[in-house]
């Protein structure tokens, strides 16, 4: 893991790094030392590790004592994009423009990314937990939309993850992995989501095998998640990662 920059403000330290070809950012409380809970933060489709919502959420968590890490998903942000991914995203945009339901199209894109994303996250988790200011503490995952689509296969495969905040995605292509998830989950649904049909979101929630799972449903479209849900997710992680 090679760090390229470090800044601190408002009690939070932000460090940019690369691990092999994976670019990422680590947020920790300023002057942090010793083991603490770690949250893996997955960004949405077409976004990147320093999208405004990702940074705001990460800083909120870090200000309360958590370590938080975000990486660019395959073919996003500072990572190279291949021709196949370009073809898939072009088909997705064309399908949505033609009025097709995006569920199956989005699932195809996530499937193309998921196997590499899982390997990337597992490598990042191992590397970050070797740092003195993070250590081998409890781990959570937070991801909406594509962050959920890539997070579900990760959580199903990675026993170090003990709790997750997910949502804004349907069940297409995810039922089998969701059925392997037994950790506590907080799941968000936007009731008027124009990208993900409500019944598909609810079907994904239902497919999760977690004995403890809660559904947070709010009115509004895909990007209209109320800001108070960040605080709610913080309390969820504080309960399960303390």
Pin down the residues of each PLM region:
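Primarily recognizes the serine-hydrolase "nucleophile elbow" in alpha/beta-hydrolase
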Residues: 116-180
């Amino acid at each position: 893991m090679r760090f390229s920059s470090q800044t601190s403000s408002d009690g939070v330290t932000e460090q940019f790094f690369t691990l092999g070809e994976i670019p990422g950012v680590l947020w920790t409380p300023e002057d942090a030392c010793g083991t603490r809970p770690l949250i893996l933060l997955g960004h949405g489709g077409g976004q990147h590790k320093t999208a405004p919502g990702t940074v705001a959420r990460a800083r909120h968590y870090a200000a309360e004592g958590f370590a938080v890490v975000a990486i660019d998903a395959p073919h996003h942000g500072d990572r190279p994009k291949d021709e196949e991914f370009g073809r898939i995203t072009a088909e997705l945009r064309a399908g949505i423009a033609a009025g097709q339901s995006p569920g199956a199209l989005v699932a195809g894109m996530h499937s193309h990314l998921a196997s590499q994303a899982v390997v990337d996250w597992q490598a990042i988790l191992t590397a970050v937990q070797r740092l003195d200011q993070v250590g081998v503490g409890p781990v959570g995952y937070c991801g909406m939309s594509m962050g959920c689509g890539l997070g579900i296969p990760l959580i199903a495969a990675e026993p170090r993850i003990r709790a997750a905040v997910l949502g804004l995605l349907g069940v297409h292509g995810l039922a089998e992995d969701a059925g392997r998830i037994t950790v506590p989950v907080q799941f968000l649904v936007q009731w008027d989501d124009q990208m993900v049909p409500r019944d598909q979101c609810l079907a994904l929630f239902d497919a999760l095998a977690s004995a403890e799972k809660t559904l947070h449903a709010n009115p509004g479209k895909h990007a209209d998640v109320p800001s108070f849900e960040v605080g709610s997710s913080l309390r969820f992680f504080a309960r399960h990662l303390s």
